[in-house]
Amino acid sequence: MRPNARAINQPRPIKITRHYTKHAEGSVLVEFGETKVICTATVEDSVPRFLKGQGKGWVTAEYGMLPRSTHSRMQREAAKGKQGGRTMEIQRLIARSLRAMVDLEALGERAITLDCDVIQADGGTRTASITGACVALIDAINFLLKNGTLTTNPIKGLVAAISVGIVNGETVCDLEYVEDSIAETDMNVVMMEDGRMIEVQGTAEGEPFSHAELLTLLDLAKQGCEQLFVAQRVALAE
């Protein structure tokens, strides 16, 4: 039986709280069960050097975990003097995922940075970050539309992400830490709301998985993301 007696296709309770901080153009607290991430969107009227003069914008992301977001304290990466490989991999994934939902030409020569700070980790921090940052990004775009900086909405659609895996021989959706730590297969799937996939990251931690299991996992991810899109729409309507 899964933790909290969840069905195999049932994500953890999802909560998205908008306007969570005071200063950012978009800010969200996203909760996937006990995993909690603050996502803020910052708009700047400049782009990276490689994009200057091209009339296109940019969306990027940074990711980090508070020292006591986990069971035991982690040293801050700033204290170490460099980011770890896992951190860089995750923030690149978040940035790629969010760029897929934006028409960069319609954004114009400005950049939006999404900062995703994990305040409590219980599995799925990268998927929660993407799902919450999507809403923060839309709020930042709406800020630009409302003040007249933008006249055309560059948002192509919602983006959400969820983990799926095989635990004790059973395919399951939205793994929390106790499941993730013993999973035979772990996979993260990022999707647009029209069903197209942005990224699939899958690894056999124990037993290799079959083609049939892969298709089952992708179907579970689609079902899970559809529930996340509902949560995003509800939050954006508030």
Swiss-Prot record:
Record: residues binding phosphate: 86, 124-126
Biological processes, Gene Ontology terms: rRNA catabolic process; rRNA processing; tRNA processing
Catalytic activity: tRNA(n+1) + phosphate = tRNA(n) + a ribonucleoside 5'-diphosphate
The keyword Nucleotidyltransferase is assigned to this record: yes
Coiled coil start-end: none
HAMAP family, A to Z: RNase_PH
Protein name: Ribonuclease PH
Organism: Histophilus somni (strain 129Pt) (Haemophilus somnus)
Phylogenetic classification of the source organism: Bacteria, Pseudomonadati, Pseudomonadota, Gammaproteobacteria, Pasteurellales
Gene name per UniProt: rph
